[in-house]
Amino acid sequence: MAPLHHILVLCVGFLTTATAEAPQEHDPFTYDYQSLRIGGLIIAGILFILGILIVLSRRCRCKFNQQQRTGEPDEEEGTFRSSIRRLSTRRR
């Protein structure tokens, strides 16, 4: 019975060493999602406040509706404006 007892102790010893935590290597695919979430919320909050400040400052105007003035009005612009005036006076 002694050899069976030794084999049983040897098997239990192997199992404990196999299940013991080995030194873990750094896994490059393990991320800290809590700090990533907090950082994202901080950046989103800063961008939101910056957007509100830009809208309230009224410095950002629509550029597509403003034309560069060269000094002389375009001929087409003058005829277009006059045609609009003519149409608006007819409706009254």
From Swiss-Prot:
Residues 83-92 have a biased composition (Basic residues). Its main location: membrane. Pfam families: ATP1G1_PLM_MAT8 (PF02038). PROSITE patterns: FXYD. It comes from the Eukaryota. A lipid is attached at C60, C62 (S-palmitoyl cysteine). Present in heart, esophagus, stomach, aorta, skeletal muscle, smooth muscle, and liver but absent from brain and kidney. The chain crosses the membrane at residues 36-56. GO terms for cellular component: apical plasma membrane; caveola; intercalated disc; sarcolemma; sodium:potassium-exchanging ATPase complex; T-tubule. The modification Phosphothreonine is found at T79, T89. Keywords: Cell membrane, Glutathionylation, Ion transport, Lipoprotein, Membrane, Palmitate, Phosphoprotein, Potassium, Potassium transport, Signal, Sodium, Sodium transport, Sodium/potassium transport, Transmembrane, Transmembrane helix, Transport. Major plasma membrane substrate for cAMP-dependent protein kinase (PKA) and protein kinase C (PKC) in several different tissues. Phosphorylated in response to insulin and adrenergic stimulation. Phosphorylation at Ser-88 stimulates sodium/potassium-transporting ATPase activity while the unphosphorylated form inhibits sodium/potassium-transporting ATPase activity. Phosphorylation increases tetramerization, decreases binding to ATP1A1 and reduces inhibition of ATP1A1 activity. Phosphorylation at Ser-83 leads to greatly reduced interaction with ATP1A1, ATP1A2 and ATP1A3. Palmitoylation increases half-life and stability and is enhanced upon phosphorylation at Ser-88 by PKA. Associates with and regulates the activity of the sodium/potassium-transporting ATPase (NKA) which transports Na(+) out of the cell and K(+) into the cell. Inhibits NKA activity in its unphosphorylated state and stimulates activity when phosphorylated. Reduces glutathionylation of the NKA beta-1 subunit ATP1B1, thus reversing glutathionylation-mediated inhibition of ATP1B1. Contributes to female sexual development by maintaining the excitability of neurons which secrete gonadotropin-releasing hormone. Homotetramer. Monomer. Regulatory subunit of the sodium/potassium-transporting ATPase (NKA) which is composed of a catalytic alpha subunit, a non-catalytic beta subunit and an additional regulatory subunit. The monomeric form associates with NKA while the oligomeric form does not. Interacts with the catalytic alpha-1 subunit ATP1A1. Also interacts with the catalytic alpha-2 and alpha-3 subunits ATP1A2 and ATP1A3. Very little interaction with the alpha subunits ATP1A1, ATP1A2 or ATP1A3 when phosphorylated at Ser-83. Interacts with non-catalytic beta-1 subunit ATP1B1. The cytoplasmic domain is sufficient to regulate sodium/potassium-transporting ATPase activity. Belongs to the FXYD family. This is Phospholemman. It comes from Canis lupus familiaris (Dog).
